[in-house]
C-alpha cells in the first residue's frame, strides 16, 4: 500500500483551501498517536479525524480511546469511521459494528461522528445508532453498486424516519460523484411493474443537497 501522510493531505488542501477540508488519520494503538493528533490538528490545520478500526485493530468503544474522543469533542473535530464490510481477510469485522459507537456517543454526546457506508451490511444497527444520538450521522458512500441492497437500506431509513441523519458521500476515487448521484436517483426504477413502496424522491434529493458542513460544525 502507498502511505499517505497527514502532511500530504495538508499540502493538497493548501492548493485550494476555499473548497477543500482535510481530515487527519491516526492509529490509536500506536504509542505516538497523541503527537500525531496534535500535529495534524494544531500544526497542519486539519479539521476532522478519519479512523479505520478494523485495520488498526481496535474497538471504538475501548475505554483507552476516551482521550481521543474527549479531544475530538472539545475541539469540535468530526470523526469519520469506517463501519461495515471489508474485503481484507485479516481485518476483524467485529470492530466495524455500528453498535460499538452507541457507547461512545452516550459518553460523549457532543461528539460529531459519521458512520461511513451506512454500516452495510449492518444497516439496522447503524439506523438504530443515528436515530438515538443527535450528533451521529451516516453517509451513503460506495453503496450504489448494489442497488437492491441500497433500496432496502434506505427503505429502513425511511421507515425509521432518519432521512435527516444521512449525508451524501462517494468514496472517491473508487467511484465518482456523477455515478453516485445516478445510482441514488435511479433506485426507484428497479421497482417498475411492482407494488413495492417507493423511496421518497424529495427526501432523497434533500439528502443530496444537505448542508453537511454546517451539521458537522465545519463552517
Regions flagged by a language model, labelled:
Residues 3-95, 136:
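Active-site gating/metal-coordination segments in enzymes
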Residues 5-10, 33-36, 98-101, 122-125, ...:
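Alpha-helical scaffolding within the catalytic cores
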Residues 23-24, 50, 113-116, 139-141, ...:
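Active-site neighborhood of phospho(di)ester-bond hydrolases with catalytic His/Asp-centered motifs
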Residues 28-32, 56, 85-89, 119-127, ...:
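Active-site environment of divalent metal-dependent phosphoester hydrolases
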Residues 39, 160-167, 179-219:
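Mid-to-C-terminal alpha-helical segments outside catalytic/metal-binding sites
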Residues 91-98, 123-132, 148-155, 175-188:
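Histidine/acidic-residue-rich catalytic or RNA/ligand-binding cores of hydrolases
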Residues 104-107, 113, 175:
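A generic "structured core" feature
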Residues 136-147:
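His/Asp/Glu-enriched short active-site or ligand-binding loop at hydrolase and phosphoryl-transfer sites
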Amino acid at each position: 500500500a502507498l502511505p499517505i501522510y497527514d502532511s500530504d493531505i495538508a499540502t493538497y488542501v493548501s492548493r485550494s483551501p476555499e473548497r477543500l477540508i482535510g481530515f487527519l488519520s491516526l492509529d490509536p494503538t500506536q504509542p505516538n498517536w497523541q503527537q500525531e493528533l496534535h500535529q495534524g490538528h494544531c500544526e497542519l490545520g486539519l479539521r476532522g479525524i478519519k479512523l479505520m478500526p478494523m485495520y488498526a485493530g481496535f474497538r471504538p468503544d475501548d475505554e483507552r480511546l476516551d482521550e481521543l474522543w474527549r479531544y475530538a469533542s472539545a475541539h469540535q473535530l468530526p470523526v469519520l469511521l469506517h463501519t461495515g464490510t471489508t474485503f481484507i481477510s485479516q481485518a476483524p469485522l467485529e470492530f466495524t459494528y455500528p453498535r460499538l459507537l452507541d457507547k461512545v456517543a452516550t459518553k460523549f454526546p457532543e461528539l460529531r461522528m459519521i458512520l461511513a457506508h451506512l454500516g452495510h451490511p449492518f444497516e439496522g444497527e447503524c439506523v438504530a445508532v443515528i436515530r438515538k444520538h443527535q450528533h451521529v450521522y451516516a453517509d451513503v458512500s460506495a453503496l450504489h453498486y448494489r442497488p437492491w441492497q441500497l433500496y432496502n437500506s434506505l427503505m429502513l431509513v425511511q421507515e425509521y424516519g432518519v432521512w435527516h441523519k444521512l449525508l451524501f458521500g462517494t468514496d472517491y476515487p473508487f467511484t465518482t460523484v456523477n455515478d453516485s448521484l445516478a445510482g441514488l436517483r435511479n433506485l426507484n426504477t428497479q421497482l417498475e411493474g411492482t407494488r413495492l413502496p417507493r423511496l421518497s424522491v424529495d427526501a432523497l434529493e434533500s439528502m443530496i443537497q444537505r448542508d453537511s458542513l454546517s451539521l458537522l460544525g465545519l463552517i
